[in-house]
């Protein structure tokens, strides 16, 4: 008798995606992050659902409702900090996942890569709107500063900002709609994840060598299921340690002050996972130029497949490209640090140098190095 998992209409979809899926035998732990992101998304949707049961999206009560969750709801503090720090884990996994794709040339699967970029934008939008909901000082001023950037769009900018705000400033209407979108977007993200996987399973996974692995495949279960479970345990241990020992480590103390439109915090900055883009935004003294650079800092990922000029897919056997890749990582760390610093000397010039280097490495140095490596390898 044929196994039910191979005949049942629903089970055979799950079977072909997670059980009998042929996977390359050489996948390293860098391939764990896709499944870790799935776990992060699940944790965020679950904790978010329970938080939404107690949260009120009204400017008068939003801050107090979060306080109520932490003080009066059973394990409300745990839900709140799991959700807040879960977002940080989500972005750590996201950036490592994208970094792995860049290093091993996974971007040559263009459909999967482009859906991944859409996913990145959707998750960033979700996180930004979620940060506004506690209605602390940094929530309010972060929302004001970031939404106000849209006013740099010629002709329609000012009207667009007022349309998003639902008035002439960030207020009750803004908070209500941000809550609505923050609730909705994770489900759109889930749908995009399914499309992402659909395209991935059309081509099969890449592997560290970048060489086609068709002759050497193994079933996903039990080999990679057990490997993924180890990843889950490590990540959930790290998240638990963060939540239970220092839940406010990655947050901003200003967000424990209720939002006050009459009092601007000395340093307005987003959560740590947006600081690199914020530093690029601030490094250009022109408003529209800064906004374009901000968008391009993420959208530049879309041109990476076009700029792949190497005859080899992966960087595994390309030491010069490896050096540039790790230089890019160092530049991103520098930008993250600069994004959290005040706009003064020497931070301004460091930020501008790092921003120029970021675009220079991706657009010029990496393609040029690829051509040089082709020449050195007589290709």
From Swiss-Prot:
GO terms for biological process, alphabetical: mitochondrial electron transport, ubiquinol to cytochrome c
Entry annotated with the keyword Transmembrane helix: yes
Cofactor: heme b
Organism lineage string: Eukaryota, Metazoa, Chordata, Craniata, Vertebrata
Similarity remark: Belongs to the cytochrome b family.
Pfam families registered for this protein in UniProt: Cytochrom_B_C, Cytochrome_B
Cofactor: how and how many bound: Binds 2 heme b groups non-covalently.
Record-level Gene Ontology MF annotations: metal ion binding; ubiquinol-cytochrome-c reductase activity
Leader sequence residues: none
Compartment(s): Mitochondrion inner membrane
Keywords: Electron transport, Heme, Iron, Membrane, Metal-binding, Mitochondrion, Mitochondrion inner membrane, Respiratory chain, Transmembrane, Transmembrane helix, Transport, Ubiquinone
Binding residues for heme b b566: 97, 196
Organism of origin: Vampyressa bidens
Matching SUPFAM superfamilies: a domain/subunit of cytochrome bc1 complex (Ubiquinol-cytochrome c reductase), Transmembrane di-heme cytochromes
Gene Ontology CC terms, in alphabetical order: mitochondrial inner membrane; respiratory chain complex III
Name of protein: Cytochrome b
Segments traversing the membrane: 33-53, 77-98, 113-133, 178-198, 226-246, 288-308, 320-340, 347-367
Residues annotated to bind a ubiquinone: 201
């Amino acid at each position: 008798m044929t196994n039910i998992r191979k005949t049942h209409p629903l089970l055979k979809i799950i079977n072909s995606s997670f059980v009998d899926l042929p996977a390359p035998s050489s996948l390293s732990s860098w391939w764990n992050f896709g499944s870790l992101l799935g776990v992060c998304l699940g944790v965020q949707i679950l904790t978010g659902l329970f938080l939404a049961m107690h949260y009120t999206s009204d400017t008068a009560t939003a801050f107090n409702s979060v306080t109520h969750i932490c003080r009066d709801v059973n394990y409300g503090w745990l839900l709140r900090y799991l959700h807040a720090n879960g977002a940080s884990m989500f972005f750590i996994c996201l950036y490592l996942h994208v970094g792995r794709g860049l290093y091993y040339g996974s971007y040559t699967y263009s459909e999967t890569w482009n859906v991944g970029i859409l996913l990145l934008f959707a998750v960033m939008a979700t996180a930004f709107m979620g940060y506004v909901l506690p209605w602390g000082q940094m929530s309010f001023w972060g929302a004001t500063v970031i939404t106000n950037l849209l006013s740099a769009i010629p002709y329609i900018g000012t009207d667009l900002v007022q349309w998003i705000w639902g008035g002439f400033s960030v207020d009750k209407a803004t908070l209500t709609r941000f809550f609505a979108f923050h609730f909705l977007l994770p489900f759109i993200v889930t749908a995009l994840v399914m499309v992402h996987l659909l395209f991935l399973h059309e081509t099969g996974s890449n592997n560290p060598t970048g060489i086609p692995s068709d002759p050497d495949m193994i079933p996903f279960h039990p080999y990679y299921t057990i490997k993924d479970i180890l990843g889950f345990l490590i990540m959930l241990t790290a998240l638990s340690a963060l939540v239970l020992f220092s839940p406010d480590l990655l947050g901003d103390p200003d967000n424990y002050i209720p939002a006050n439109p009459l009092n601007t915090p000395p340093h307005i900055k987003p959560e740590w996972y947006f600081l690199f883009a914020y530093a690029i935004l601030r490094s250009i003294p022109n408003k529209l130029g800064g906004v374009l650079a901000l968008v391009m800092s993420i959208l530049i990922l879309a041109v990476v497949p076009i700029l792949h000029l190497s005859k080899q897919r992966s960087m595994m056997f390309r030491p010069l490209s490896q050096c540039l890749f790790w230089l890019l990582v160092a530049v991103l760390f520098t930008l993250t640090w600069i994004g959290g610093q005040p706009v003064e000397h020497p931070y301004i010039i460091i930020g501008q140098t790092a921003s120029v280097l970021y675009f220079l490495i991706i657009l010029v140095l990496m393609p040029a190095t690829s051509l040089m490596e082709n020449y050195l390898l007589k290709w």
